Structure formats: C-alpha cells, structure tokens
Amino acid sequence: MIATGLALSVCYPNAGNIAGGGFLVYRTSDGKYGSLDYREKAPLLATKDMYLDSVGNVIPDKSLIGGLAIGVPGTIAGLYEVHKRFGSLSWEELVEPSINLAKKGFVVTKKQNQSFRSKRAEFISVNGKNTFFGRDYEEGDIVVNPIYAKTLELIQKKGKSGFYEGLNAERLVNTVKQKGGIISKQDLLKYSPIWRKPIQFKYKELNITSMSPPSSGGICLGQLFGMIEPYEIGQYDHNSLESIQLIVEAERRSYADRSEYLGDPDFIDVPANLILDSVYLRNRMINFDWNKATLSSEIK
C-alpha cells in the first residue's frame, strides 16, 4: 500500500498523492477489522462562511480552486501510521521506488496524455505557466521530476516530520498563502490521523465492512443495500429499466440523508444506527414507484 501509493504520486497523481488524504479499511489474517481516517482537515483559521459572499451566496469555485480549496494534508501521516502498526519492510525501503521513479522518469501513456491536457489550462491558471504539469507532454515522453524526488528523499530520511516540519513545511505554507490559503505551520504540526471503528452491515448472506464517518461511503452503501434488499433485483437484467429505477431511487434517498445527517463525528452526532435501521429503510422506500421518479420534495 505505502510503496504503491507513493509511486502513484509520481506517475499517476490522479490516484496517488502526498498532499491529500484518504481512508483505510482493513481485515487482518486473523479476522480483525479496523479503519484509519487520514483525510484532509480544515485549517485552524477556517470558518463556516469562508466560501460565501456578504449576502450568504456560495462563491463559485472558491472551495475547488486556489489556496482556500486546500485542506491540511493527511496522506504522509496516514501512511506513516499504517507503517507503524502493520509495516514489515523498513520505511526507507518503501519510499525508495518512488524516488527512483521521480529521478529516472516514467513514460507518458495515451490516457495520461489526455488527462494532463484536459487539466493543463487549469494548472497554469492557478500556478503559472512554469508549473510542472503545465508542460505539454506527449504520449511516449519520459517525465523526470528531480525536485519531487528531493521531497520524497526528505520523507524517506525523516519520516512524517520530513513532510510536516522543516523545509518542506515552510515551502508548503508559503505557497498556499501566496495562493490565498490559510494553512499554517501549526496546522501541519497538529495533524494526526484517527483510528476509527468501521461500519459493518449485511446484504442477504454477505457481511460488508466499510468506512465510517466522516466518510459518507459506508453509510450510503449500507442504506442502498438495505433499501433494495426487499426487492429481487437479480430477476432484472443489468441496466434494465427496472434495475435502474430501483437503484437510482434508492440512491436519491440515501443522498438526501447524506446531506441531512452525515458529517464529521468529531463535531456532530451522526445517527448511524437510526438511518441504517431496516424499519427506517423500508419506510424510506414506502413512496417508491416503479413507473415514475419520486418528487424531490417527497424525498427530503
């Protein structure tokens, strides 16, 4: 997991990073389950109205582009925590392949070329024309990133402190501030991943384990399975009108509950047991109709 994630951060950043975050759900060989929350956190200076204008309207893209769109990174702290608990190889060994990839380069695939080009204008708009991913890479090009290799070497040598302290932390904070962000050195020093109890539920004869809040995924999956379980969905063809109608209507109800009830359990009470209860889920589908979409006003 660690070596793969760091390697992806070099050659396929859509799927790997060192400045983002994530969730881990695991099952050990002796049947124990657990999960780790290492998602990004809001900076200490964040406020609930920071993406709103003076009259309370959402400012377009302010939460998506620029310095204020950036949360306090959790990836390296999360990977380091996983290594402390489960690692068998040394941290240095696990970071080494990504350093080699950054130094020696990787070959741009057709899909990567398309991905880079689709985001190139946005990278340049936010970071300037000299930004690394602002270059016009072609399929077959070899991409070498020696500056990133040096960052990874700091992480290899010093562990998570190589990212959250010292030179890298200073550069990260300064760059984010230049882009209008509010992440501080204190934010980086205070960051800590959290071991959480995962969500567990059944679908027919299957036992399913997934991520608990602040992820919405586990609860939404549990609700979705609970709402469709009374129906014999297996009798319908894949992507048939019947299967799509059932799944979409269940998803609409789950996402309505997601907006209403879910959030970070460190700050709010999430009524997980209530909204995963089988009686509640049956009642949620009481106005389901095979022949038409339920009005949104009747789903809230």
Regions inferred by a protein language model and the residue ranges of each:
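Noncatalytic scaffold domains of N-terminal-nucleophile
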Residues: 2-165, 170-216, 276, 283-292
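Protein kinase glycine-rich loop
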Residues: 223
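Short helix-capping/linker segments at secondary-structure and domain boundaries
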Residues: 84-89, 157-160, 228-235, 258-262
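Internal maturation/activation junctions in enzymes
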Residues: 230-300
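Flexible, polar/acidic helix-loop-strand segments at domain edges
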Residues: 219
